[in-house]
Protein backbone atom coordinates (compact mmCIF):
# COMPACT_ATOMS: atom_id res chain seq x y z
CA UNK A 1 0.00 0.00 0.00
CA UNK A 2 1.28 3.46 -0.92
CA UNK A 3 2.28 5.51 2.11
CA UNK A 4 0.33 8.74 2.42
CA UNK A 5 2.07 12.12 2.56
CA UNK A 6 0.07 13.01 5.67
CA UNK A 7 -1.11 10.69 8.41
CA UNK A 8 -2.98 13.12 10.66
CA UNK A 9 -4.61 16.52 10.28
CA UNK A 10 -4.93 18.83 13.31
CA UNK A 11 -7.54 21.57 12.89
CA UNK A 12 -7.46 24.60 15.20
CA UNK A 13 -10.64 26.16 16.69
CA UNK A 14 -9.96 29.43 14.85
CA UNK A 15 -10.44 27.59 11.56
CA UNK A 16 -13.77 26.14 12.70
CA UNK A 17 -15.03 29.58 13.80
CA UNK A 18 -13.93 31.16 10.51
CA UNK A 19 -15.68 28.48 8.45
CA UNK A 20 -18.93 28.82 10.43
CA UNK A 21 -18.80 32.61 10.03
CA UNK A 22 -18.16 32.19 6.29
CA UNK A 23 -21.12 29.83 5.93
CA UNK A 24 -23.47 32.10 7.90
CA UNK A 25 -22.49 35.19 5.88
CA UNK A 26 -22.95 33.49 2.50
CA UNK A 27 -26.17 31.81 3.61
CA UNK A 28 -27.79 35.21 4.26
CA UNK A 29 -27.14 36.61 0.77
CA UNK A 30 -27.52 33.53 -1.43
CA UNK A 31 -28.77 29.99 -1.66
CA UNK A 32 -25.43 28.20 -1.82
CA UNK A 33 -25.46 24.75 -0.28
CA UNK A 34 -21.76 24.85 0.60
CA UNK A 35 -18.88 27.30 0.81
CA UNK A 36 -15.24 26.84 -0.15
CA UNK A 37 -12.05 28.28 1.30
CA UNK A 38 -8.30 27.81 1.61
CA UNK A 39 -6.49 26.24 4.57
CA UNK A 40 -3.22 27.65 5.90
CA UNK A 41 -0.79 25.93 8.20
CA UNK A 42 2.46 24.04 8.43
CA UNK A 43 3.79 20.50 8.15
CA UNK A 44 5.45 18.69 11.04
CA UNK A 45 6.76 15.45 9.59
CA UNK A 46 3.56 13.56 8.65
CA UNK A 47 1.25 15.73 10.78
CA UNK A 48 -0.51 18.67 9.14
CA UNK A 49 -1.25 21.58 11.49
CA UNK A 50 -4.09 23.74 10.09
CA UNK A 51 -3.95 27.01 12.01
CA UNK A 52 -5.74 29.52 9.76
CA UNK A 53 -8.02 29.86 6.75
CA UNK A 54 -9.72 32.34 4.48
CA UNK A 55 -12.82 32.24 2.30
CA UNK A 56 -12.72 32.14 -1.50
CA UNK A 57 -15.53 33.14 -3.91
CA UNK A 58 -16.98 29.91 -5.27
CA UNK A 59 -20.03 28.92 -7.26
CA UNK A 60 -21.25 25.76 -8.97
CA UNK A 61 -24.14 24.52 -11.04
CA UNK A 62 -26.57 22.37 -9.09
CA UNK A 63 -27.54 20.38 -12.17
CA UNK A 64 -24.11 19.93 -13.79
CA UNK A 65 -21.27 19.03 -11.39
CA UNK A 66 -18.63 19.76 -14.02
CA UNK A 67 -19.56 23.46 -14.07
CA UNK A 68 -17.99 25.38 -11.20
CA UNK A 69 -16.03 28.58 -10.58
CA UNK A 70 -13.28 29.46 -8.11
CA UNK A 71 -11.72 32.94 -8.12
CA UNK A 72 -7.96 32.40 -8.63
CA UNK A 73 -7.04 36.09 -8.48
CA UNK A 74 -8.81 36.56 -5.15
CA UNK A 75 -7.05 33.48 -3.77
CA UNK A 76 -3.60 34.71 -4.79
CA UNK A 77 -4.18 38.24 -3.49
CA UNK A 78 -5.48 37.01 -0.12
CA UNK A 79 -2.60 34.57 0.26
CA UNK A 80 -0.14 37.37 -0.49
CA UNK A 81 -1.61 39.48 2.34
CA UNK A 82 -1.64 36.55 4.77
CA UNK A 83 1.97 35.78 3.88
CA UNK A 84 3.00 39.30 4.88
CA UNK A 85 1.44 38.79 8.32
CA UNK A 86 2.78 35.28 8.96
CA UNK A 87 5.29 33.87 6.50
CA UNK A 88 5.29 30.46 8.21
CA UNK A 89 1.67 29.78 7.27
CA UNK A 90 1.47 28.28 3.80
CA UNK A 91 -1.35 26.89 1.70
CA UNK A 92 -1.83 23.28 2.80
CA UNK A 93 -5.21 22.50 1.27
CA UNK A 94 -8.80 23.63 1.07
CA UNK A 95 -12.12 23.12 2.79
CA UNK A 96 -15.80 23.01 2.04
CA UNK A 97 -18.88 22.57 4.21
CA UNK A 98 -20.10 19.39 2.51
CA UNK A 99 -21.37 17.74 4.53
CA UNK A 100 -20.29 14.92 2.16
CA UNK A 101 -17.88 14.55 -0.75
CA UNK A 102 -19.04 15.97 -4.09
CA UNK A 103 -18.31 14.66 -7.57
CA UNK A 104 -16.32 17.75 -8.57
CA UNK A 105 -14.09 17.69 -5.46
CA UNK A 106 -11.37 15.82 -7.37
CA UNK A 107 -11.27 18.54 -10.04
CA UNK A 108 -11.14 21.31 -7.43
CA UNK A 109 -8.39 19.45 -5.58
CA UNK A 110 -6.34 19.20 -8.79
CA UNK A 111 -6.63 22.97 -9.14
CA UNK A 112 -5.46 23.47 -5.54
CA UNK A 113 -2.37 21.36 -6.28
CA UNK A 114 -1.02 24.35 -8.20
CA UNK A 115 -0.49 26.04 -4.85
CA UNK A 116 0.20 22.94 -2.73
CA UNK A 117 1.40 19.61 -4.24
CA UNK A 118 0.02 17.57 -1.31
CA UNK A 119 -3.30 19.38 -1.06
CA UNK A 120 -5.58 18.15 1.73
CA UNK A 121 -9.36 18.45 1.66
CA UNK A 122 -11.10 19.01 5.00
CA UNK A 123 -14.88 18.76 5.05
CA UNK A 124 -16.26 20.79 7.96
CA UNK A 125 -19.86 20.07 8.91
CA UNK A 126 -21.28 23.36 10.18
CA UNK A 127 -24.60 21.71 11.14
CA UNK A 128 -23.66 18.38 12.73
CA UNK A 129 -26.61 16.17 13.61
CA UNK A 130 -24.67 13.68 15.71
CA UNK A 131 -22.11 13.99 18.46
CA UNK A 132 -18.53 13.73 17.20
CA UNK A 133 -15.86 15.62 15.32
CA UNK A 134 -17.23 18.01 12.69
CA UNK A 135 -14.17 17.48 10.46
CA UNK A 136 -13.31 14.83 7.87
CA UNK A 137 -9.91 15.00 6.14
CA UNK A 138 -9.04 13.48 2.75
CA UNK A 139 -6.02 13.34 0.45
CA UNK A 140 -6.11 12.35 -3.22
CA UNK A 141 -4.42 9.10 -4.29
CA UNK A 142 -4.20 6.96 -7.41
CA UNK A 143 -6.63 4.05 -7.22
CA UNK A 144 -5.56 0.85 -8.97
CA UNK A 145 -8.46 -1.28 -10.23
CA UNK A 146 -8.44 -5.07 -10.10
CA UNK A 147 -9.82 -5.40 -13.62
CA UNK A 148 -6.78 -3.77 -15.24
CA UNK A 149 -8.50 -0.53 -16.22
CA UNK A 150 -6.47 2.70 -16.02
CA UNK A 151 -5.91 4.20 -12.60
CA UNK A 152 -8.16 7.01 -11.41
CA UNK A 153 -7.98 9.71 -8.79
CA UNK A 154 -9.88 9.14 -5.57
CA UNK A 155 -9.84 10.40 -1.99
CA UNK A 156 -8.24 8.52 0.89
CA UNK A 157 -9.52 9.24 4.39
CA UNK A 158 -7.00 10.73 6.83
CA UNK A 159 -7.30 10.87 10.61
CA UNK A 160 -8.31 14.31 11.87
CA UNK A 161 -8.57 15.88 15.30
CA UNK A 162 -9.16 19.25 16.96
CA UNK A 163 -6.06 20.81 18.52
CA UNK A 164 -5.27 24.21 19.97
CA UNK A 165 -2.49 26.24 21.49
CA UNK A 166 -2.73 27.59 25.03
CA UNK A 167 -4.12 30.98 23.98
CA UNK A 168 -6.80 29.33 21.84
CA UNK A 169 -7.75 26.96 24.65
CA UNK A 170 -8.36 29.92 26.96
CA UNK A 171 -10.63 31.56 24.39
CA UNK A 172 -12.57 28.34 23.79
CA UNK A 173 -13.02 27.88 27.55
CA UNK A 174 -14.51 31.38 27.79
CA UNK A 175 -16.91 30.64 24.93
CA UNK A 176 -18.00 27.35 26.49
CA UNK A 177 -18.45 29.03 29.86
CA UNK A 178 -20.77 31.61 28.31
CA UNK A 179 -22.95 29.06 26.49
CA UNK A 180 -22.92 26.37 29.17
CA UNK A 181 -26.30 25.75 30.79
CA UNK A 182 -25.67 25.84 34.51
CA UNK A 183 -29.21 24.67 35.29
CA UNK A 184 -28.52 21.22 33.87
CA UNK A 185 -27.40 18.76 36.52
CA UNK A 186 -24.38 16.52 36.24
CA UNK A 187 -26.40 13.30 36.01
CA UNK A 188 -28.73 14.56 33.28
CA UNK A 189 -25.77 15.97 31.37
CA UNK A 190 -23.97 12.62 31.49
CA UNK A 191 -27.08 10.80 30.30
CA UNK A 192 -27.53 13.31 27.48
CA UNK A 193 -23.92 12.82 26.40
CA UNK A 194 -24.39 9.05 26.39
CA UNK A 195 -27.55 9.36 24.30
CA UNK A 196 -25.74 11.58 21.78
CA UNK A 197 -22.86 9.10 21.71
CA UNK A 198 -25.21 6.19 21.00
CA UNK A 199 -26.88 8.19 18.22
CA UNK A 200 -23.48 8.85 16.68
CA UNK A 201 -22.58 5.15 16.91
CA UNK A 202 -25.90 4.22 15.30
CA UNK A 203 -25.29 6.58 12.38
CA UNK A 204 -21.81 5.10 11.82
CA UNK A 205 -23.22 1.57 11.86
CA UNK A 206 -25.86 2.59 9.32
CA UNK A 207 -23.11 4.03 7.09
CA UNK A 208 -21.16 0.76 7.33
CA UNK A 209 -24.24 -1.29 6.48
CA UNK A 210 -25.06 0.97 3.54
CA UNK A 211 -21.50 0.67 2.23
CA UNK A 212 -21.47 -3.13 2.50
CA UNK A 213 -24.86 -3.36 0.77
CA UNK A 214 -23.62 -1.22 -2.12
CA UNK A 215 -20.46 -3.35 -2.42
CA UNK A 216 -22.52 -6.55 -2.35
CA UNK A 217 -24.84 -5.30 -5.10
CA UNK A 218 -21.93 -4.09 -7.25
CA UNK A 219 -22.73 -0.37 -6.98
CA UNK A 220 -19.31 0.28 -5.41
CA UNK A 221 -15.97 -1.42 -6.09
CA UNK A 222 -14.38 -3.57 -3.39
CA UNK A 223 -11.84 -1.70 -1.29
CA UNK A 224 -9.84 -4.38 0.47
CA UNK A 225 -8.36 -1.98 3.02
CA UNK A 226 -11.84 -0.97 4.23
CA UNK A 227 -12.94 -4.62 4.36
CA UNK A 228 -9.87 -5.56 6.41
CA UNK A 229 -10.49 -2.71 8.85
CA UNK A 230 -14.14 -3.73 9.26
CA UNK A 231 -13.03 -7.30 9.88
CA UNK A 232 -10.65 -6.09 12.60
CA UNK A 233 -13.54 -4.20 14.22
CA UNK A 234 -15.76 -7.27 14.14
CA UNK A 235 -12.99 -9.41 15.63
CA UNK A 236 -12.76 -7.03 18.60
CA UNK A 237 -16.46 -7.39 19.39
CA UNK A 238 -17.21 -9.65 22.39
CA UNK A 239 -19.18 -12.86 21.98
CA UNK A 240 -22.35 -12.02 23.91
CA UNK A 241 -23.66 -15.58 23.61
CA UNK A 242 -21.03 -17.00 25.97
CA UNK A 243 -22.40 -18.11 29.34
CA UNK A 244 -19.52 -16.42 31.19
CA UNK A 245 -20.27 -13.10 29.51
CA UNK A 246 -23.99 -13.35 30.30
CA UNK A 247 -23.27 -14.22 33.94
CA UNK A 248 -20.77 -11.36 34.33
CA UNK A 249 -23.25 -8.95 32.73
CA UNK A 250 -26.03 -10.02 35.10
CA UNK A 251 -23.74 -9.71 38.13
CA UNK A 252 -22.65 -6.22 37.17
CA UNK A 253 -26.23 -5.18 36.43
CA UNK A 254 -27.42 -6.56 39.78
CA UNK A 255 -24.66 -4.71 41.62
CA UNK A 256 -25.62 -1.48 39.89
CA UNK A 257 -29.30 -1.99 40.68
CA UNK A 258 -28.45 -2.64 44.35
CA UNK A 259 -26.50 0.61 44.46
CA UNK A 260 -29.43 2.47 42.86
CA UNK A 261 -31.88 0.87 45.32
CA UNK A 262 -29.72 1.76 48.34
CA UNK A 263 -29.29 5.30 47.06
CA UNK A 264 -33.07 5.69 46.68
CA UNK A 265 -33.65 4.22 50.15
CA UNK A 266 -31.09 6.54 51.74
CA UNK A 267 -32.61 9.49 49.91
CA UNK A 268 -36.06 8.59 51.26
CA UNK A 269 -34.74 8.24 54.83
CA UNK A 270 -32.96 11.59 54.59
CA UNK A 271 -36.11 13.24 53.21
CA UNK A 272 -38.20 11.75 56.06
CA UNK A 273 -35.62 12.90 58.60
CA UNK A 274 -35.70 16.41 57.15
CA UNK A 275 -39.50 16.37 57.28
CA UNK A 276 -39.47 15.43 60.98
CA UNK A 277 -36.88 18.10 61.75
CA UNK A 278 -38.94 20.66 59.88
CA UNK A 279 -42.08 19.71 61.81
CA UNK A 280 -40.25 19.95 65.15
CA UNK A 281 -38.79 23.31 64.16
CA UNK A 282 -42.23 24.64 63.18
CA UNK A 283 -43.74 23.39 66.47
CA UNK A 284 -41.00 25.05 68.51
CA UNK A 285 -41.42 28.26 66.54
CA UNK A 286 -45.19 28.27 67.14
CA UNK A 287 -44.68 27.57 70.85
CA UNK A 288 -42.13 30.36 71.12
CA UNK A 289 -44.41 32.76 69.29
CA UNK A 290 -47.34 31.91 71.63
CA UNK A 291 -45.13 32.37 74.70
CA UNK A 292 -43.99 35.75 73.43
CA UNK A 293 -47.61 36.82 72.92
CA UNK A 294 -48.54 35.77 76.48
CA UNK A 295 -45.53 37.60 77.90
CA UNK A 296 -46.47 40.69 75.91
CA UNK A 297 -50.05 40.59 77.24
CA UNK A 298 -48.79 40.14 80.80
CA UNK A 299 -46.41 43.06 80.44
CA UNK A 300 -49.18 45.31 79.13
CA UNK A 301 -51.44 44.26 82.05
CA UNK A 302 -48.70 45.04 84.58
CA UNK A 303 -48.14 48.42 82.97
CA UNK A 304 -51.84 49.24 83.25
CA UNK A 305 -51.91 48.25 86.93
CA UNK A 306 -48.87 50.42 87.65
CA UNK A 307 -50.46 53.37 85.89
CA UNK A 308 -53.65 52.84 87.89
CA UNK A 309 -51.72 52.75 91.16
CA UNK A 310 -49.93 55.97 90.23
CA UNK A 311 -53.21 57.70 89.42
CA UNK A 312 -54.71 56.54 92.76
CA UNK A 313 -51.70 57.88 94.64
CA UNK A 314 -52.00 61.24 92.93
CA UNK A 315 -55.71 61.45 93.80
CA UNK A 316 -55.01 60.73 97.49
CA UNK A 317 -52.27 63.39 97.55
CA UNK A 318 -54.69 65.95 96.11
CA UNK A 319 -57.31 65.08 98.78
CA UNK A 320 -54.77 65.49 101.59
CA UNK A 321 -53.75 68.91 100.28
CA UNK A 322 -57.35 70.03 100.26
Swiss-Prot record:
PANTHER family for the chain: 26S PROTEASOME NON-ATPASE REGULATORY SUBUNIT 7 (PTHR10540:SF7), EUKARYOTIC TRANSLATION INITIATION FACTOR 3 SUBUNIT F-RELATED (PTHR10540)
Region (Disordered) location: 281-322
Superkingdom, natural source: Eukaryota
Family: Belongs to the peptidase M67A family.
Protein name: 26S proteasome non-ATPase regulatory subunit 7
Glycyl lysine isopeptide (Lys-Gly) (interchain with G-Cter in ubiquitin) crosslink, residue number(s): 180
Alphabetized GO MF terms: metallopeptidase activity; protein homodimerization activity
Species of provenance: Bos taurus (Bovine)
Summary of subunit composition and partner proteins: Component of the 19S proteasome regulatory particle complex. The 26S proteasome consists of a 20S core particle (CP) and two 19S regulatory subunits (RP). The regulatory particle is made of a lid composed of 9 subunits including PSMD7, a base containing 6 ATPases and few additional components. Within the complex, PSMD7 interacts with subunit PSMD4 through their respective MPN domain. Interacts with TRIM5.
N6-acetyllysine sites (modified residues): 204, 214, 314-315
Any further remark recorded for this protein: Does not bind a metal ion.
Boundaries of every MPN domain copy: 9-144
Amino acid sequence: MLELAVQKVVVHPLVLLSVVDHFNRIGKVGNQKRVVGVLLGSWQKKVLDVSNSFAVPFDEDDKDDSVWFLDHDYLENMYGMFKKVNARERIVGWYHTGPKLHKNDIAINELMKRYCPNSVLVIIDVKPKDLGLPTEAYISVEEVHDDGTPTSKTFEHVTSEIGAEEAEEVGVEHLLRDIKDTTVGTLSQRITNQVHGLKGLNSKLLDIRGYLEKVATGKLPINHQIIYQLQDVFNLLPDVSLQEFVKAFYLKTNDQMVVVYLASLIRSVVALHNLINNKIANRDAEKKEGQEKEDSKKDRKDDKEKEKEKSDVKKEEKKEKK
